[in-house]
Design a protein with these regions (language model features):
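Membrane-embedded helix-loop-helix hairpins and adjacent transmembrane boundary segments
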Residues: 1-481
Length: 481
């Protein structure tokens, strides 16, 4: 009961802190729509790097990673996050280009180069995906609170998580999101960095734990190189076309900061990969002494609760909630931003909104979308399959149009437009054939992105050989010259 009390105090303190951040930022820092949507484009290295890291680290990279290490993956589970870390390195090439666009959203950039149809289709895919992800992540945050503090009813936990997310995101916008991301990732990293050596020491030390593990558990490539490479490409594709990632690069104070933030994020994520993996292995070695759920689903919390002080367990509890909530707030704000910035004008919105109206309607979208998401989560609507599908479909189609649209100045309009449709169709077909998994060691989002790139290059080659002019620039500065 002491552990639950410590966890409750720390988790509630964290949630109150997040609401205070949102309120203060909203009152002091939000002067116009640029402040609300892209943090005034003045964020520094550490703010952006920690925000990128927080958005990459979800429940799957904390409790999920420990569970994989406990299961068949062993120490090779570390690649589940290390692959994401490595994917941030080539992303550093695109980071300054993203910042240079001076855009707010991905559909805005796609529309500049390849026209209104491309922009509208990309916006619809992104908004549907972000809504599904927001729904599941608010639900996941509530479920984590309930699992850690079961004395609070599940629906109350869900409402609590949803209300906190709505409050600080709606009041503080992107600035509050980034400040909260900094705090959240700090809690995750510091909490796990403190807890892991304490657990290992009280469990007999790493030498004793490793001696109790089967040999395959200590094989760094147990999952196979095909899976490792597949995860790398999967992360790269989803990062480049992920609204929550792109929006962070848009907030950088300059292009150099964007490059450095991407590389620092890679370092931070590599550090994060270590701790849950070690805790999962410790839980496996000590499983005869622990009351674990099936397949070690709660391995990280159980081994921490058994071998670390209550306050450390509470810190880990807050870290797990941070991991899910940091994704929920970003997806919620990105979705509302696209509705006002892209969907509204793209589908017939006549009235040009001023700064105050943009902020008001974006905040209204935040509240409405989050309330609907909370209702869906309360009725236990299964979203896992839908989320997997939505997460890929927002990236596979627009991958070439956005990524190569930034990098290939001579691209034609049809190369971007056609690649969006072929990439999306390829993703859907591969998702069906692979039944949501992999086929020939290739994940659906990677296959869809590959098809979109091939289509983009072929159409562009054919049209340029026929003398068709290049599409307009993705960069406002170049268009103004």
């Amino acid at each position: 009961m002491e552990i639950q009390t410590d966890a409750l105090i720390i988790v509630l303190a964290y949630m109150v802190g997040m609401m205070v951040v949102g309120y203060v930022v909203g009152k002091i820092n939000i002067k116009g729509s640029a402040d609300y949507l892209v943090a005034g484009r003045r964020m520094g290295l550490f703010m952006v790097a920690f925000s990128l890291s927080a958005n990459n680290i979800g429940g799957g990279c904390t409790t999920g990673l420990a569970q994989k290490a406990f299961g068949d993956w062993g120490i090779s589970a570390i690649w589940y996050v290390l692959a994401a870390s490595l994917a941030m390195i080539p992303l550093a090439y695109f980071a300054p280009k993203i910042r240079k666009t001076m855009a707010v959203t991905i559909p805005e950039v796609v529309g500049r180069r390849f026209g209104k149809v491309s922009s509208n289709f990309t916006a619809v895919l992104s908004v549907l995906s972000l809504f599904c992800l927001t729904s599941s992540q608010i639900g996941a945050s509530g479920a984590v609170i309930h699992a850690l503090i079961p004395t609070i009813p599940a629906n109350v936990c869900l409402l609590l998580a949803g209300f906190v997310t709505i409050f600080y995101t709606t009041f503080g916008g992107m600035i509050a999101d980034q400040v909260s991301d900094l705090i959240q990732f700090g809690i995750i990293l510091v909490g796990l960095a403190i807890a892991t050596p304490i657990v290992l020491k009280h469990a007999g030390g790493w030498a004793e734990i490793s001696a109790a593990l089967p040999g395959e558990k200590l094989n760094f490539t147990q999952i196979g190189w095909a899976s490792i490479i597949g995860y790398f490409f999967n992360y790269f594709c989803t990062f480049l076309c992920g609204p929550e990632m792109v929006s962070r690069f848009e907030t950088c104070k300059d292009e150099k900061t964007a490059v450095r933030a991407s590389l620092l994020c890679a370092v931070l994520m590599a550090a994060m990969a270590i701790f849950p993996t070690l805790l999962g292995l410790a839980a496996f070695a000590l499983q005869d002494k622990l009351e674990l759920a099936e397949k070690g689903a709660d391995a990280m919390m159980v081994v921490t609760g058994a071998y670390a002080p209550g306050i450390i367990t509470g810190l880990i509890a807050a870290a797990i909630i941070c991991a899910t909530m940091s994704s929920a707030d970003s997806n919620l704000l990105c979705m509302s931003t696209m509705i006002i910035n892209d969907i509204y004008p793209g589908f017939g919105g006549k009235k040009k909104l001023n700064d105050k109206q943009v902020i008001f309607y974006t905040r209204l979208c935040n509240v409405i979308a989050a309330l609907i998401a909370m209702c869906i989560a309360m009725f236990k609507v299964p979203l896992t399959t839908m989320n997997t599908f939505a997460f890929g479909i927002r990236c596979a189609g627009p991958f070439a149009a956005y990524g190569l649209g930034l990098a290939v100045p001579n691209a034609t309009k049809n190369s971007g437009l056609i690649s969006i449709f072929t990439g999306t169709i390829a993703f859907v077909v591969w998702q069906f054939l692979a039944e949501g998994g992999t086929l020939f060691f290739m994940m659906p989002v990677v296959f869809g992105s590959l098809v979109s790139v091939i289509t983009f290059c072929l159409v562009n080659l054919i049209e340029r050989s026929r003398g068709i002019p290049a599409a307009p620039s993705a960069y406002v500065v170049e268009e103004a010259k």
